[in-house]
Amino acid sequence: MQFDPPLQPAILLKRYKRFLADVITPDGRELTLHCPNTGAMTGCAAPGDTVWYSTSDNAKRKYAHTWELTETQQGAVICVNTLRANSLAKEAISSGIIPELSGYNQLKSEVKYGEENSRIDIMLQADDRQNCYIEVKSVTLAEKEYGYFPDAVTTRGQKHLRELMAVAANGDRAVILFAVLHSAIDRFSPAHHIDARYAQLLTEARDKGVEILAWKAELSTTKMTLNKPIAVVLNPGK
């Protein structure tokens, strides 16, 4: 995925109302950016961090600029636009980068499924195999070399795991793909210390046939690619 036109830098002043952030550009202008991230954004939004933003040519948008990346004062690069995770996953699957998800000839998005009024992020289909349901989650919370999900309690995420377990029980493939969008993360673990129920359900899902994948993105201010598998550790420290 390439950024065209290129992203522009600014210094973060503050994030507020979840969806907004004030920044100051190198030439001294103060802008308000749209923040496409409803999470806690722990470690991704410290005042003084460098942010990189895109600009839309849609005149109907109230906020023309979108916060895409954070470059922290410690040197990490993070994609904070959670909407990019699905696009990166689709690109990686279509390009054959993820071997576990290769061999399908149809890719569909936002397909209704399950008994809890859900939509699957990605469905893969082929004539000679069962359907593959893929839920994509964006990982940006870093503590030491570990990346954690979620960064806040997520009843919606818990629902998705229940739905995936039902898919596996019905004989189709069920996959949860954690898209790691933080340059300092080398391993993935569920956030027991934030949402213990989600962590418990993830282990239960694994035991009931849900496949767990974690792939790390190569991030820059010009392009992003989901291209590196990393270890999944369901119970770190044990």
Curated annotation (Swiss-Prot):
Name of the protein: Sugar fermentation stimulation protein homolog
Upper classification of the organism: Bacteria, Pseudomonadati, Pseudomonadota, Gammaproteobacteria, Enterobacterales
CDD domains: SfsA-like_bacterial (cd22359)
Listed InterPro entries: SfsA (IPR005224), SfsA_C (IPR040452), SfsA_N (IPR041465)
Pfam families per record: SfsA (PF03749), SfsA_N (PF17746)
UniProt family annotation: Belongs to the SfsA family.
Highest taxon listed in the record's lineage: Bacteria
GO MF term set: DNA binding
